[in-house]
Design a protein with these regions (language model features):
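A short, histidine- and acid-enriched strand-loop-helix "catalytic/donor-clamping" loop
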Residues: 85-100
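Nucleotide-activated donor-dependent transferases that construct or modify glycoconjugates
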Residues: 1-14
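Donor nucleotide-sugar binding/catalytic pocket of nucleotide-sugar-dependent glycosyltransferases
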Residues: 113-146
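Short amphipathic alpha-helix
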Residues: 15-28
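Short acidic/histidine-rich motifs immediately flanking catalytic phosphotransfer sites
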Residues: 54-59
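Membrane-proximal helix-turn-helix segments that form the acceptor-binding/catalytic region
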Residues: 99-116
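Short His-centered aromatic/hydrophobic patch
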Residues: 62-68, 89
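A short beta-strand-loop structural module common to alpha/beta enzyme folds
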Residues: 34-44
Length: 146
């Protein structure tokens, strides 16, 4: 399976989510999957044709339900991208109920996400209460990918 893995701001300064995402990409490669990392930054928001790069992939894996997820979800909702969308939530994006910008990203992304993988078992209830339908807690992340 060819997987396009969208990770926000991959560079020299990596936060915990970026490091975990790169570890996950390496684990998927060890299992024989073809994983390409797509770094996402705020400049990509103004590039309206970046979705065309996803046409050669079977699945789009997004490292967090944030701006990058909302951006590619718009293309899926418009019918420009017809790939399986899998998002991974590390908790900060799902739990942030007071942050209006993150709430907007969640509302945009929710209908386009085919599978939401959460890394903590308590996030299943939180995600379902926020309207996500197919939520799965996976101790071994790679086993949740179709």
């Amino acid at each position: 399976m060819r997987i396009a893995f969208v990770v926000a701001r991959v560079g020299e300064e990596r936060n915990v989510i970026q490091r975990l995402s790169l570890v996950l990409a390496d684990e998927l490669r060890k299992q024989g999957e073809n994983v390409d990392i797509f770094p996402f930054n705020r400049r990509k928001v103004f590039s309206f044709f970046s979705y065309k790069k996803l046409s050669n992939y079977d699945c789009v894996l997004i490292s967090n339900v944030g701006l990058q997820c909302a951006y590619f979800s718009i293309f899926k909702r418009l019918g420009l991208v017809k790939k399986l969308f899998v998002a991974i939530s590390f908790g900060s994006d799902i739990r942030a109920t007071r942050n209006k910008l993150i709430n907007l990203f969640n509302r945009i992304s929710r209908p386009a996400i085919d599978l939401l993988i959460v890394v903590n078992p308590d996030l299943v209830v939180v995600a379902k209460s926020r309207g996500y339908k197919n939520v799965q807690y996976v101790p071994s992340w790679a086993s949740a990918l179709p």
